[in-house]
């Protein structure tokens, strides 16, 4: 079955979307933030304000097909327009830190060695799952939110407590 955006339209391979929480009152869309002593915003976080959409992301899969389904491994890349210069050569990947694996940016050449994500139906929306090393669905783990000491709502590999998401076209008017 095809993946759908918030308008009920089919999610397009290479399309640009805001990734927003499905439930109201749980923060805004996904964006990038500096945490700790970082000089560049490398962490994928949920915007603190519920009305903030976050940063647009391109959702794509290497097979050149138009329509995305839950069967495909996906790449989710934040748009490079207006990104700080320190991020231009970075891609997204989970990285082990403390209790959870945070979703952080790393150099693109390192990213190829890590697993991919899939979008899975979850309640009436979707959840993003991380499949280490591109392994089978049984070993895929949910991506959820963990609040750190600085009140950042970090996206982490947190099996069993997923962030329910929906996708809003970045170019949508109104």
Curated annotation (Swiss-Prot):
The keyword Transport does not apply. Activity is retained when heated for 10 minutes up to 60 degrees Celsius. Inactive at 100 degrees Celsius. It holds the Pfam family Kunitz_legume. GO terms for molecular function: serine-type endopeptidase inhibitor activity. InterPro entries: Kunitz_inhibitor_STI-like_sf, Prot_inh_Kunz-lg. Retains activity after incubation for 10 minutes at pH 2.0 to 12.0. The record marks 64-65 as: Reactive bond for trypsin. Keywords: Disulfide bond, Protease inhibitor, Serine protease inhibitor. Disulfide bonds join 40-86, 131-140. It comes from the Eukaryota. Belongs to the protease inhibitor I3 (leguminous Kunitz-type inhibitor) family. Inhibits trypsin and chymotrypsin with a 1:1 stoichiometry, with dissociation constants of 1.56 nM and 120 nM respectively. Inhibits plasma kallikrein, factor XIIa and plasmin with dissociation constants of 5.0 nM, 150 nM and 18 nM respectively. Does not inhibit factor Xa, thrombin, tissue kallikrein or cysteine proteinases such as papain and bromelain. This is Trypsin inhibitor.
């Amino acid at each position: 079955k095809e993946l759908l955006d918030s308008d009920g339209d089919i999610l397009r391979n290479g399309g640009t979307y805001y990734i927003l929480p499905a439930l109201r009152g749980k923060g805004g869309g996904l964006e990038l933030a500096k945490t700790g002593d970082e000089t560049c915003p490398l962490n994928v976080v949920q915007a603190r304000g519920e009305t903030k959409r976050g940063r647009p992301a391109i959702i794509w899969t290497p097979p050149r097909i138009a329509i995305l389904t839950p069967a495909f491994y996906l790449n989710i890349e934040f748009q490079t327009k207006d990104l700080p210069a320190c991020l231009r050569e970075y891609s997204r990947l989970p990285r082990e830190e403390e209790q959870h694996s945070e979703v952080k940016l790393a150099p693109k050449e390192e990213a190829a060695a890590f697993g991919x994500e899939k979008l899975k139906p979850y309640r009436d929306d979707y959840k993003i799952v991380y499949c280490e090393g591109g392994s089978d669905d049984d070993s895929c783990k949910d991506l959820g939110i963990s609040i750190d000491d600085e009140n950042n709502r970090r996206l982490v590999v947190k099996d069993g407590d997923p962030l329910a998401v929906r996708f809003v076209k970045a170019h949508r008017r109104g």
